[in-house]
Design a protein with these regions (language model features):
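Charged, alpha-helix-forming regions
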Residues: 1-287
């Protein structure tokens, strides 16, 4: 008797590039916006920009989830040296916890293309662990993508049912960029709990979780950050402290409820606002 190979159980952790997670990449609102780029300057003389492909928009909340799921699969596959991932769109959407239908298939195809074509510009902001230096130049999130809308064995059958072609999911092959893989393999990474990440329904909470893990990897159990800097680093479009607090409060409550934060306080000192985070223990955050 020939036994079918056992499927590898889904990875409970997700490895992500710590250098990239310290920088803003994804808009946290999918509402209409005139933003043509994301710009972040952590210090004088250093600048980070995210530029969409001509005619497209900046990566948003769905793209954020797609990108994290790609790295979930990279972790699950044992960090393949070539960075190549192969999957059906159907299985990918199911793993993301998304509805599977013709609309979401097209949404996923569009998102993968957007991630591939979005340009990242680093002026001494992106840290390259292999050279222990900050990079100058352009980067991409994905090196290559290809999507075969029909499995070869099914092509002749699908020709008999043309109405199914538009919604047929297809098989994707995606290559993660080498610079991010190099950092992760070198240990310059953050580690998320996949089950806990999936319970966070707020895009802001998901982004905050990743940013707080950057602070943890840099040796912080408590992290104080200026509210204005936090807004730029996430990024958030709101600028007034009262507006930012309204956006952050539900995310903070969600992170505390999930056991990822022990406490968070917003404090005003002179004319500036700060956020003080107390992180939960590592054993709870990777459960």
């Amino acid at each position: 008797m020939v036994l079918a190979p056992r499927r590898r159980p889904p990875a409970r952790t997700i490895l992500l590039d710590r250098a990239l997670e310290a920088l803003p990449v994804f808009r946290l609102s999918d509402s209409a916006s005139d933003d043509t780029c994301i710009t972040y300057s952590p210090e004088e003389g250093r600048r980070w920009r995210v530029l969409p492909s001509p005619g497209d928009r900046l990566p948003g909340t769905f793209d954020q989830d797609v990108y994290v799921e790609l790295w979930h699969r990279f972790t699950e596959a044992g960090c393949p040296a070539d960075g190549v991932l192969r999957f059906t769109l159907h299985a990918f959407l199911r793993s993301m916890g998304r509805r599977v239908d013709g609309r979401t298939y097209e949404q996923l195809r569009t998102s993968l293309a957007r991630l591939h074509h979005t340009r990242l510009e680093s002026a001494a902001t992106y840290y390259d662990a292999s050279t222990d230096s900050f990079m100058e130049g352009n980067l991409a999130l994905l090196t290559a993508i290809s999507i075969d809308r029909r499995r070869s064995a099914d092509r002749e059958q699908l020709q008999l049912f043309p109405a199914l072609n538009a919604a047929e999911p297809g098989v994707a092959q995606v290559t993660l960029s080498s610079w991010a893989r190099t950092n992760v393999v070198a240990g310059h990474a953050i580690m998320l709990s996949a089950p806990l990440y999936g319970t966070l329904t707020s895009p802001v909470a998901r982004r905050l979780y990743r940013l707080l893990e950057v602070a943890r990897e840099e040796g912080s159990v408590t992290w104080r950050v200026a509210l204005e800097q936090l807004a730029e680093q996430l990024p958030l479009s709101q600028r007034y402290p009262s507006h930012l607090q309204r956006v952050l409060q539900p995310a903070h409550e969600m992170l505390i409820g999930a056991g990822l934060l022990r406490d968070v306080q917003l404090r005003q000192h002179a004319r500036s606002w700060y956020v003080d985070y107390v992180l939960a223990s590592r054993s709870r955050t990777v459960a």
